[in-house]
Amino acid sequence: TEDGTGSGWAGATHYDWSRIDPSKLGARATQKARTSVHPMAIEPGRYTVVFEPTAVGNLVQFIAGALNARAADEGRSFFSLPGGKNKIGQKIVDERVTILSDPFDPDVAGSPFTGDGLPTQRVVWIENGVVKTLNYDRYWAQKNGRAPTASGGSIKMSGGTTSIDDMIKSTQRGLLVTRFWYLRPVDQRTILYTGLTRDGTFLIENGKITKPVKNLRFNDSPVFMLNNLEAMGIPERVSASEGGDPGQAIMVPPIKVRDFNFTSLSDAV
């Protein structure tokens, strides 16, 4: 904004240009900027949070990035178990969560082949909260007597039917988060990350957005987040990179979660 106290953002990405409405996105970003000026400071802590889809994509991509079978088998990841075992077959998140890759899905189409020349296929990583497979490259698959996992790199997460408006209406006190940036790993064994909210963070009181708030730093894991689900909306394709460029094909829903951990305030706009 002109006074330097507020900012807004909206974005969309799709292979079909008819699915993108630039005027609607521009109006949404402008509205967020105007309503985010002169934000108030709030106490850091654990909050109920309504995450817009882009914020969800910012975090869920780190679960997908941690699905490396070799790192799990060697004891270096969240998906590791003692004795060189891994978490395939274990429930790790809410049973409403399914995460898959499908290079032939028109909403999240990916490459027909991998970097090492394998034809890609539909791969279900997490189904009803349970780890179904990990990402095996050619070498690690051969070493373990398995077929390599050639997924094409896209991410699609299951959703629900609750709108963002209804998530807000059902929230006594919480926050609405548009998206994140400056996302950095803290502990890969728990997929713990830190980062900052940006471009529209708002206080929810008694089912209504009441005030803009200063941006906050979080320290939390998308795994913890997906274990604290209260509601999910309809998935949509998002620009999940920090810069807002299309990047990886990701389709995720808006979600409402409890007890998301914010640790400090930021003066960043």
Q: Which role does the model predict for each range below?
A:
Residues P82-V269:
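Dual-mode signal for accessory low-complexity, basic/Gly-rich regions
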Residues T1-L67:
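Internal alpha/beta scaffold segment
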Residues N68-L81, G145:
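Mature, solvent-exposed C-terminal subdomains and processed small-chain segments of exported/organellar
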